[in-house]
Amino acid sequence: MRVLVTGATGFTGGHLARALAAKGDEVTALVREKAAEQDGVRVIHGDLRDPAALAAATAGIEIVYNIAAIYRQAGTATETYRAVNAVAVRDLIEAAARHGVKRVVHCSTVGVHGDVEHPPASEDAPLKPGDVYQESKLEGERLAREAGQRLGIEVTIARPSGIYGPGDRRLLKLFRGIARRRWITLGDGEIYYHLTYIDDLVAGFRLCGEHTAAANRTYILAGGEVTTLNALVGLVADAAGVPEPVWHLPAWPFWVAGAACEVICAPLGVEPPLFRRRVDFFTKSRAFDISRARAEIGFDPRVSLREGIRKTLDWYRANRWL
């Protein structure tokens, strides 16, 4: 299979590109940064916003996996989020259609559902993004579907939840704080949390790309276990061989402080030392229903939370990230 992976220099895209190459696919990666060809992956340098780069990258491709996105970055303009996470998605699908690509798998996020009031949330749960990043991802979904219907190309939307694993930086602070015995939980810690180990997510992406039933469908891809934040902290502490943290502080003063930091730092284009989104980690439940993906395409996450945490922590230690 001839496949294109965008965002292949990132955590998720990199794992996907290497896995596809390992199983025998001819993998092309469209990347912005200078990167040498490795692990059987052919590299094309370019930007999703560049029509010439899209044309070169999609020529001769059968399946496109669009993993590239701009994540939350201080000082990033709303229009930049929209240009990369929405408009460029449409442009990529149009380029793919012109070159006869069969299917585009677009990586969105469960964040398009916003704060889940009645967990677990399915793909049909209300869509109410809570920030500019989530809004841009939701618009990307809409533009992707519209382009697919207009051009007659198959488009599959994947909404991952809480991605983690070797090489991930987003949960590094959690692991590092617990391993160094400096972790304090804000709130009671009884919110739900739903993580997805990277190997399971990669398997889900492949099913989205290759399974006949996945054409023009939307799937939540998440791990097989839902846990509470307290239980998650306990699992990390156990894997790290340290006592489980017991300190808790009220969350609301930190949320207020985060709001103030955002107001002060945003005009300066610097990342706030504390922001509301970070406090939301402690206060908003995230639990999702993956029964559609299980039933329709055979998605079957196999890495237990305990095993995934151990593998991730071992990698952090081996690479001296902890």
Which functions belong to the PLM regions below?
Residues V3-K23:
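N-terminal Rossmann NAD(P)H-binding glycine-rich loop of SDR-like oxidoreductase domains
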Residues A35, H45-R90, A95, V110-D115:
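NAD(P)H-binding glycine-rich loop region in Rossmannoid oxidoreductase-like domains
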Residues D91-Y133:
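Conserved Rossmann-fold NAD(P)-dependent oxidoreductase catalytic core, especially the SDR/UDP-sugar
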Residues G114, I153-L172:
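Flexible, glycine-rich beta-alpha linker
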Residues G130-T156:
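Active-site Tyr-X1-5-Lys
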Residues E139, D168-K173, G187-G209, N216-R217, ...:
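Substrate-positioning beta->alpha
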Residues L207-L274, I290, R306, R310-K311:
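Mid/C-terminal beta-alpha module of Rossmann-like enzyme folds, strongest
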Residues R292-A295, D300, S304-L322:
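Amphipathic terminal alpha-helices
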